[in-house]
Amino acid sequence: YPAADSPIVPEENIIIGNTVLYGAISGETYFRGIAGERFAVRNSGAATVVEGVGDHGCEYMTGGCVVVIGSTGRNFAAGMSGGVAYVLDEVGDFEKRCNLAQVELEPVQAEDVSDVALKRDDLSEVMSDMLRGDARRVRVMIERHALYTGSTRARLILENWVKYLPRFIKIMPVDYRRAVREMEATAEEPQPLAVAGE
């Protein structure tokens, strides 16, 4: 994030260059400002919050979680085959900038987040089930973003959560969703017991 005495307004300026998080496999990042083009390209496991991205954001992403609390460029999610992204669509035109060849868009459903406890050391609780708990996941990640960067944008969203939550869109690859559901179904099936001597 920019220095405290910097005259720039972070959420209105590109503060990180192109291809940041290229091929990231784990970890967390929080960027107070806008990213250049191809942000999180080939991301396969990192969790991140950014205040806007250029063209081709989340291109060829295979895992991880990206939360964008600003605008995006064109061709978002092109070739995205895994992971989940959330975009704050304040204007209502994100669908025109998203590459829908492999992903589906859905609203983030409201849920009770009053019991969300901010844990500085662990995101695993909200990252364990990418099919459910979207509002909790987004809320925790934005809270961490505010904590680590002092983002005024994040604070505004958190203070007006009921207003902003319906404007978030979840982006999830179709085949990834199907694979996760199949794994869940397999895990729920009773496993036959082996009998000695058979």
Place the predicted regions along the sequence by residue.
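Long, distal/terminal scaffolding or interaction modules
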Residues: 1-198
